[in-house]
Structures are given as structure tokens and as C-alpha cells.
Amino acid sequence: MDRTTVVPSPASTYCSFMGGSQHSPLRRSQRLIDKENRDLQKIPPKSLSPQLFGNTEDDYSELLLQQGKVVHLKPAAKLVPVRSSDNLVHLGSRDKVVPLKTSNRIVHLKPPYKIIHLKSLDEVEKTVKKKNNIQKEVHQRNSQRRSIQCTPKKRGRKPKQPAKKLQSRISTDQLGSTPSPSKLPAKYPAHFVHQLPPAEDSSCATRRRSLSAPAMQLSDLSLTPDEIQTPERRGEIVNKSPSDLDSDVSLNFSLSDSIGEIFGTKDISSILTMQRPRQYILLEEHLPTLATMLNVDLERLRCVLDITQGLSHEQILRFPIKHEEDELEVP
């Protein structure tokens, strides 16, 4: 009988390994080891991965051994020792230490280069014209100032001119005929106890003035400062109040004095006393009898009363009243 070589399967080798591991170690043939080495040489090292080409511990360990190879470096060139100079030169240090003086002044450094802006020819011509005009104006002003400064100023006070006598051209008749307008009424209402005194006519006043004394000019009436006799000239000492310091003679009349001259009393409360107005009560039943007494139509009387109730006391006083004589004279 011929001998037949039987290739062991992985399962048989695993079983034999598990079964014979207790008795003897596994023996692998040299041909299998060579075959595995060839296969490993064909596969590039970058594509080797234990997940793709099996999970055996041998493959993984071989990959780690290939990656962790020791690289021997070439020996470096010979070191050339640097020759040190035999004579050492020591620098001499100064004995005196000179401290640097700090300057208090801050020196601002100016930039060395100027920024030059390029301009067109038109702009350059305009700027030149403006500069020429400005120079001309400055020259004119300087010439005017020099001409003004050349004329010497007259120092000293100007001589006072003699005061001219003012002659009043306004006649006394014109002064009397044009009095200042008064805001007071000509006559107060009847309910005022105190009334204004009757105003004199301007014509009568001028006649009295003309008959009493001849007309005099205003310049004759005014007093000169030499003619005024003050207590200081008489030798009297007078304690002036602050109000009298500005004016020695006070010609202003007080309001109470002027009121006293007009109404005869200075008590304002008595001047403003008024009579109580009379009140009449008129009933609707009395209207017919009142109309017959006044000889007026009843409806007309009612209309007049309605109108008067809406008016004030001042409006009623200003209302024009027609007398019976005027109505009779009209044809």
C-alpha cells in the first residue's frame, strides 16, 4: 500500500493542539514557516492590519517587530577642537564711575521728511492768486495804518465853547392852549360823593395870565447857580440823607399831596366811598299801572325792562337819552 500524505485541517490542528497541549508542544513544519514568511514579504507593510488579515497573535507581533526596528545612525565626523588663544587680554575698568545726567527738557523730534501732496496746475494757479491777493490787502492795510500814525494826535482837553442862550420861540398862548391830555373823566357818576373841581377854560386862563403880568421868556425865569442860595454858602451845616445827596432841591410832589389838592383830603378810603344804589322791586302785576302812568305801551315797557336787565351799570350810564323837547321840535 502506498503512503498518502494527509494535509491537516485547521480544525484538526486546533483539536490536536487542544488535546495534545497537555502532553507535548505543537510542532510546525519548516515549509509552513517559509510560506508564511513569503506571504508577509509580498504584502506591503502599510496595508497590514490585524483586523483584515486575521486576528492571530503571531501576525500582530511580527508587524510590531517590523515597525519597531532599531535604526543605527552613522558615526559623526571627528570633532575639531577650537584652539583657544594663549594670551588672555583683560579689559581695564575705569576707577571713576561717571553717572549720566538726565535733562529735564523734553525734546520733541521733528519728522525728517515732509509729506508733499501733488496738486494739479489749476489748483496751483488758484493758490498763487489767493496768496497775491492776500499780500495786496495786507500791504494796503499797513499803508493805511502808517498814514494814520503819521498824523500826530492832539493831546489835551478841547476848549469849552461858550454856552449859547436858548431863546424859546413858543409863545405863552400856545402853552396854555395845548394842555397835556388827562385820563380822568370830566365828571364822575352821581354815586361818587367827592367830585372833581370844575376845570377852568384855557381861554379864560390865558386871559387872566395876560392881564395879570406881561409875558416873560423862559431864560428869564430860570435861575443861575450863582443866584441859588444854599445852606452851605450861608455857613450852615446840614446832614444830608442818602436821597438828598444827588439833588439839593427836590421838586417832585408826592401822590398824597396831589390827591389832597384835587379832592381836598388825602384819605383814599373816603375818596372812594360810594352811595348805595337804590333798589326797586317791580312785580308783573304792577306793569300795567306803570305803563298807564308813563303813557307807554305795555309790550314796549316789557321789552325795555328785558334789555336793561342784560346791561351793566356803566353801559346804562353811557346809553344816550332823548328828551321830550327834542322830539317835539322835530317836524
From Swiss-Prot:
Gene Ontology CC: chromatin
Region listing for Disordered, in residue ranges: 132-187
Residue ranges, compositional bias (Polar residues): 168-181
Reported induction: Expressed during early meiotic prophase.
N-terminal signal peptide: none
Stretches with biased composition (Basic residues): 152-167
Keyword Zinc-finger in annotation: no
BP GO annotations: reciprocal meiotic recombination
Similarity comment: family membership: Belongs to the TOP6B-like family.
Role noted for this protein: Required for formation of the mei-W68-mediated double-strand breaks (DSBs) that initiate meiotic recombination.
Name by which UniProt lists this protein: Meiotic recombination protein P22
Organism from which the protein derives: Drosophila melanogaster (Fruit fly)
